[in-house]
Amino acid sequence: MPELPEVETVVRSLAPLVGRRIATAEFRNLRILRGGDPDLMSARLAGRKILSIKRYGKFIVAVIEGGGHLMIHLGMTGKLLLGGPSGKHTHAVLTFDRGTLLFDDSRQFGCIEYSEEFPKRVARLGPEPMEISFEDFAADLKRRKTRIKSLLLNQTFIRGVGNIYADEALFRAGIHPQALTSRIRIERARKLYDAIGEVLTEAIEAGGSSISDYVDAEGRSGFFQFSHRVYQRTGEPCLNCKTPIRRVIVTQRSSHFCPHCQKR
């Protein structure tokens, strides 16, 4: 699933659409729509300009002329593509005076929602991990009673971090994914806070991680996958100590870690 760095990269590649007017909007698959009639959505979008496109965690929100909001979540395999031919997995097409924007999703876990108000699903998210202060981060971490990997995946704690970057940040901070939040002292919390910011920044600079079929809106792959230190490296030697990387299940998700470098 595209996480914060991948979605941020997509949003940046969509910048040419800001200020452009939507000529037509076609929604071909009701499964990806959330609470909206396709004909009504098309009518509300046609003829209106896109005023801004921003990322909120893993969500994309385009503000539409007249006060509307178009929310998009890429799910597992969703793609937003500028131009190119429409295919069997193309579920929505926005046509502009010049060019098109396609929403492709082979597994159909992504979604599109139009609303006049700011999307409630987005409003319920926690703060951006690179905007929250350390004091607020540490205070909320202390209040939670769970395993640290589970907390990092909880989008009400901080938004946008998923399996890849939780594993990578925990490794850099030297914290075991099954460590209890109640046992993480302030010094280790600081290391984790810094590690989250560092790994997300580096991943954005690299265009994200293209592990399966992720590309940005221009069709470009990311290359941060070549910098992963633990994610999907089960059995390979730790880059710090040569101990084989291990995999455990936390909150029904695979977690990759070094048993020597990461402590509970």
Curated annotation (Swiss-Prot):
It catalyses: Hydrolysis of DNA containing ring-opened 7-methylguanine residues, releasing 2,6-diamino-4-hydroxy-5-(N-methyl)formamidopyrimidine; 2'-deoxyribonucleotide-(2'-deoxyribose 5'-phosphate)-2'-deoxyribonucleotide-DNA = a 3'-end 2'-deoxyribonucleotide-(2,3-dehydro-2,3-deoxyribose 5'-phosphate)-DNA + a 5'-end 5'-phospho-2'-deoxyribonucleoside-DNA + H(+). CDD domains: EcFpg-like_N (cd08966). Its EC number is 3.2.2.23, 4.2.99.18. It comes from Solibacter usitatus (strain Ellin6076). Its cofactor is Zn(2+). The lineage of its organism: Bacteria, Pseudomonadati, Acidobacteriota, Terriglobia, Bryobacterales. Involved in base excision repair of DNA damaged by oxidation or by mutagenic agents. Acts as a DNA glycosylase that recognizes and removes damaged bases. Has a preference for oxidized purines, such as 7,8-dihydro-8-oxoguanine (8-oxoG). Has AP (apurinic/apyrimidinic) lyase activity and introduces nicks in the DNA strand. Cleaves the DNA backbone by beta-delta elimination to generate a single-strand break at the site of the removed base with both 3'- and 5'-phosphates. One of its GO terms (molecular function) is 8-oxo-7,8-dihydroguanine DNA N-glycosylase activity. Transmembrane segments: none annotated. InterPro entries: DNA_glyclase/AP_lyase_DNA-bd, DNA_glyclase_Znf_dom_DNA_BS, Formamido-pyr_DNA_Glyclase, FPG_cat, MutM-like_N-ter, Ribosomal_uS13-like_H2TH, Znf_DNA_glyclase/AP_lyase, Znf_FPG/IleRS. HAMAP family: Fapy_DNA_glycosyl. The active site is at residues 2-3, 58, 253. PROSITE patterns: FPG_CAT (PS51068), ZF_FPG_1 (PS01242), ZF_FPG_2 (PS51066). Keywords: DNA damage, DNA repair, DNA-binding, Glycosidase, Hydrolase, Lyase, Metal-binding, Multifunctional enzyme, Zinc, Zinc-finger. Monomer. A zinc finger (FPG-type) spans 229-263. The gene is mutM. Belongs to the FPG family. This is Formamidopyrimidine-DNA glycosylase. DNA binds at residues 89, 107, 144. GO terms for biological process: base-excision repair. It holds the Pfam family Fapy_DNA_glyco. Binds 1 zinc ion per subunit.
